From Swiss-Prot:
It comes from Strawberry mild yellow edge-associated virus (SMYEaV). This is Movement protein TGBp3. It comes from the Viruses. GO terms for cellular component: host cell endoplasmic reticulum membrane; membrane. Belongs to the Tymovirales TGBp3 protein family. Keywords: Host endoplasmic reticulum, Host membrane, Membrane, Transmembrane, Transmembrane helix, Transport, Viral movement protein. It is found in: Host endoplasmic reticulum membrane. InterPro entries: TGBp3 (IPR003411). Signal peptide: none annotated.
Amino acid sequence: MRVLDLILALITAAVVGYTIALVSNSGCYVHFDGRSATTTCPPGPWVESIANGLYTAGLARPHPEPECERRQSSW
């Protein structure tokens, strides 16, 4: 997944009110638990800062770990 695609996906997910649990075809994903974001994509820190920024701005909602697992397995 290209960097721009991932950023746009994060923004789109936040704007339409979906929780953040994004998975690319490569199996890399971003999981946001309401306190911090984690990602399997290197480099992780910039992705985490975007997700944290969206949450701080009130544009993202937390979700439980199983939700991330369901989305990851369905993509």
